[in-house]
């Protein structure tokens, strides 16, 4: 199974995705970590662009056929990145579960963005203005959605787990 968490920075994707990965023993791929490793390597002359997503796609595709559940944590702001995950799941012959994480309380979302510590060495967390300006296309087909303004991270992991179990039933 390929589980892809999407949403703007500061919505709670990482907290929920890590919690779920620990709970189910899944392989966890975080786009921010991959992109920062690419920057740190000095291999790229310019901004990372889509290369972080391409690395994550390849890592997912190499692990899914081994029977591993893979959880991806990234903004996935455009149709191109979302379509790529669908293609990876199809190539691997596994189910794709898209989960969009939102925070409907704008003040709470801003507070999270402005107060969260950076947890990827070398990566400066985004500013609130950069989150507001971030490209984020509407979904063609609405995915399963979690609103972190309405629940704790523990509750969110529980709801996602229930959704995954119900989808297999």
Which residue stretches match the model-derived regions?
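Walker A (P-loop) ATP-phosphate-binding motif of ABC ATPase nucleotide-binding domains
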Residues: 2
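Hydrophobic anchor at the beta1->P-loop junction of P-loop NTPases
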Residues: 5
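P-loop (Walker A) phosphate-binding loop of NTP-binding proteins
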Residues: 8
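Conserved substrate/cofactor phosphate-moiety recognition/catalytic segment
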Residues: 11, 15-66
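Glycine-rich phosphate-binding loop used to anchor ATP phosphates in small-molecule kinases
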Residues: 51-96
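Conserved phosphate-donor/acceptor-positioning beta-strand/loop module used by diverse small-molecule
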Residues: 92-112, 146
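C-terminal alpha-helix
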Residues: 159-167
